Swiss-Prot record:
Its main location: host cell. The gene is PB1. GO terms for biological process: symbiont-mediated perturbation of host apoptosis; symbiont-mediated suppression of host cytoplasmic pattern recognition receptor signaling pathway via inhibition of MAVS activity. Is not encoded in all strains, and seems to be dispensable for replication. GO terms for cellular component: host cell cytosol; host cell mitochondrial inner membrane; host cell nucleus; membrane. Belongs to the influenza viruses PB1-F2 family. It comes from the Viruses. This is Protein PB1-F2. Residues 1-33 are annotated as: Disordered. The keyword Membrane applies. It is found in: Host mitochondrion inner membrane; Host nucleus; Host cytoplasm, Host cytosol. Transmembrane segments: none annotated. Residues 7-28 have a biased composition (Polar residues). The lineage of its organism: Viruses, Riboviria, Orthornavirae, Negarnaviricota, Polyploviricotina.
Amino acid sequence: MERGQDTPWTQSTEHTNIQKRGSGQQTQRLEHPNSTRLMDRYLRIMSPVGMHKQIVYWKQWLSLKIPTQGSLKTRVLKRWKLFNKPEWIN
């Protein structure tokens, strides 16, 4: 495949950033559309406060994906209480 041809994949993942030089000549630079946003997010996460928030978020996410024995017990008890309500028994 020639370098000049864009596939749908490259069109969707990259965009062309056109800049004008002092002489009026245009230069093109391929850049990921979210690269600056990704870098900003990375810098925020790597700050001490951002790092703490990220750790808390991942702990919450992991507790949903890999439940501990305590959280499983809580879930089972809640389900059991809902299932054994008096109006369901009659």
